[in-house]
Curated annotation (Swiss-Prot):
Belongs to the pyruvate, phosphate/water dikinase regulatory protein family. PDRP subfamily. HAMAP family: PDRP (MF_00921). Bifunctional serine/threonine kinase and phosphorylase involved in the regulation of the pyruvate, phosphate dikinase (PPDK) by catalyzing its phosphorylation/dephosphorylation. InterPro entries: Kinase-pyrophosphorylase (IPR005177), PPDK_reg (IPR026565). Its EC number is 2.7.11.32, 2.7.4.27. Transmembrane segments: none annotated. ADP binds at residues 153-160. It is an enzyme of class 2 (transferase). One of its GO terms (molecular function) is ADP binding. It comes from Rhodopseudomonas palustris (strain HaA2). It holds the Pfam family Kinase-PPPase. This is Putative pyruvate, phosphate dikinase regulatory protein.
Length: 279
């Protein structure tokens, strides 16, 4: 049994965007306020090779596995691995489909992602997801100008899950870590098109989250700079100075959920777009 304040890994595996899984899992996780889910979202898993990469991550960080996969072989392989490593797994749409089949007397078409109308909005979301996954954690900084939003922040300010959440809303989102002693990518200094949002949290909150992260990985919570109070405080101050220097929007995420953070960013983006249209 998990104790108050502890973390568990939650793996969400989908052959489509993963939005259904995210919505359902967060609605349930919200009922357990004293424990925190470390989300691992795997959208567009449609081949054995893609699934193998997912299974490797699940094996490295066992936890609850929820999935929306329609391909029988992929389902069987996922369930077998989860059973092998004693990770509970559940198909979110499986029981619902069984109920429909029993009532309608007909089987499903088996079309992956059939719940999504193939319109411009759908393809926009897929494009945003692909972009965000390619530009996670400071990767491919040469493509930052193509983003709608660029998130920056020190470690454990929820940059990646916020990026994925925004991408599920069709917003191309990149994120770049701010690391003490490492210069920021020069591309960040000259961005024109994207909204750059600097995510901040209190040193106390960061230390708590980082300690729990280390414990979840089986690492000791020593006095290294990652969780040292003075070092973390210096990180926060440096991030604020960079934000002021480059005119990035500041957003305190200390007491915000991912949904609340994303909503605030979407409002900033909408306000910015309205301002530009009026100029």
């Amino acid at each position: 049994m998990l104790t108050d304040g502890s973390y568990f890994h939650l793996h969400l595996v989908s052959d489509s965007t993963g939005e259904t899984l995210i919505t359902v899992s967060r609605a349930v996780a919200a009922q357990y306020a004293n424990v925190n889910a470390v989300e691992h979202v795997y959208p567009l898993v449609r081949s054995q090779k893609q699934l193998d990469r997912v299974l490797q991550e699940i094996e490295e960080s066992p936890g609850i596995v929820l999935f929306t996969l329609l391909e029988g072989e992929l389902v069987a392989r996922l369930e077998a691995k989860c059973q092998e490593i004693n990770s509970p797994s559940l198909s979110i749409i499986g029981p619902v489909m069984q109920l429909f089949e029993a009532y309608l007397g007909a089987s499903t078409t088996g079309r992956v992602g059939a719940q999504h109308t193939l319109n411009a909005e759908y393809f926009k979301r897929i494009d945003a997801l692909n972009y965000s996954m390619m530009h996670d954690d400071g990767q491919h900084v040469e493509g930052l100008e193509e983003a709608d939003v660029v998130l920056v922040g020190v470690s454990r300010t929820s940059k990646t899950p916020t990026s994925i959440y925004l991408a599920n809303r069709g917003i191309r989102t990149a994120n770049v870590p701010l690391v003490a002693g490492i210069p920021i990518p020069h591309q960040l200094e000259t961005l024109k098109k994207p909204l750059v949002v600097s995510l901040h949290a209190s040193p106390e909150r960061l230390i708590q989250v980082r300690q729990n992260r280390l414990l979840s990985l089986g690492a000791g919570a020593g006095n290294d700079s990652y969780i040292d109070r003075q070092s973390v405080t210096d990180e926060v101050l440096l991030a604020r100075k960079l934000s002021a220097k480059y005119g990035w929007s500041l957003l305190d995420v200390t007491r915000r959920s991912i949904e609340e953070t994303a909503a605030a960013i979407m409002k900033l983006l909408a306000d910015r777009q309205r301002q530009r249209m009026s100029e």
